Amino acid sequence: MEEVEAANRSAIESCHGVLNLLSQRTSDPKSLTVETGEVVSKFKRVASLLTRGLGHGKFRSTNKFRSSFPQHIFLESPICCGNDLSGDYTQVLAPEPLQMVPASAVYNEMEPKHQLGHPSLMLSHKMCVDKSFLELKPPPFRAPYQLIHNHQQIAYSRSNSGVNLKFDGSGSSCYTPSVSNGSRSFVSSLSMDASVTDYDRNSFHLTGLSRGSDQQHTRKMCSGSLKCGSRSKCHCSKKRKLRVKRSIKVPAISNKIADIPPDEYSWRKYGQKPIKGSPHPRGYYKCSSVRGCPARKHVERCIDETSMLIVTYEGEHNHSRILSSQSAHT
């Protein structure tokens, strides 16, 4: 370890000698190159001493990072020559203050504290800022940010959805949205000082204004007569009429499926359908007393009592009662 410490001390002393040469105004490039080579060789010796007992250790030299700045600006000594800096180096300029600042914020002129050989390389931050600037409040609108006309208004309204947006630039920097639908309305005021003024105690209350409810009044139901503009089959949505159903239990007159108890109307059978879990099918009948009558009924045998029939009527007759001797035609 003593040998490593001695080699390290010698390398550091040589490095200080190179730094002193760099800080001088007039330095010979040849001597600087020689001193730098000696420093590198001494540090390599230190690295070889450190890796001597670690087996097959290898010293890998990486590419040196080349900075675009001259090396003597990083020295502690402030003695630098302004002529050494060329115009090719990147100039570090002091950041300009923001444009939108409060009226109470006062910025003094920048006074250089440390000048490093070039007028553009200066570090200074002397600035008097009002306390209100630290509260991060957006400044009020001034004349350049106002609209050209004081009473210019941009309004967007839609009657179906009931949305009315109004932007008013007359004197105040206030955005007032209003959403109204009938008797429900609210007005919220957003000012630029991050305060919300709500006149209805419901700030940002989004009411679900459904378009479907408004469009239901304007949508016309298609009658199926191909008047909706389509040449082929009409695909318009039709509302299925809600038919009133009523069921009664009557005794069966025979064991035949076609025999049904008579009533005051004439019926014609137009189909039947098997019932799951029952050996007897369900018969479907339509009123045949008057042509075009919408009344229907279906008859099925009761599962619990085979001697009883369940008759379910659907729809209403559009004619008066007609007594008939023959109740069903098979």
Curated annotation (Swiss-Prot):
Where primarily located?
A: nucleus
GO MF: calmodulin binding; DNA-binding transcription factor activity; sequence-specific DNA binding
At the top level, the lineage of the source is Eukaryota
Listed name of the protein = Probable WRKY transcription factor 39
Q: Matching InterPro entries, A to Z? A: WRKY_dom (IPR003657), WRKY_dom_sf (IPR036576), WRKY_plant (IPR044810), Zn-cluster-dom (IPR018872)
Record keywords, A-Z: DNA-binding, Nucleus, Transcription, Transcription regulation
Subcellular location field: Nucleus
Does the record carry Nucleus as a key word?
yes
- DNA-binding interval(s): 256-322
The protein's role, per its UniProt record: Transcription factor. Interacts specifically with the W box (5'-(T)TGAC[CT]-3'), a frequently occurring elicitor-responsive cis-acting element.
SMART domains the record matches = WRKY
Which lineage do the record's taxonomy fields give for this organism?
Answer: Eukaryota, Viridiplantae, Streptophyta, Embryophyta, Tracheophyta
**Listed GO cellular component terms?**
nucleus
Q: Where is the signal peptide?
A: none
**Record keyword ATP-binding present:** no
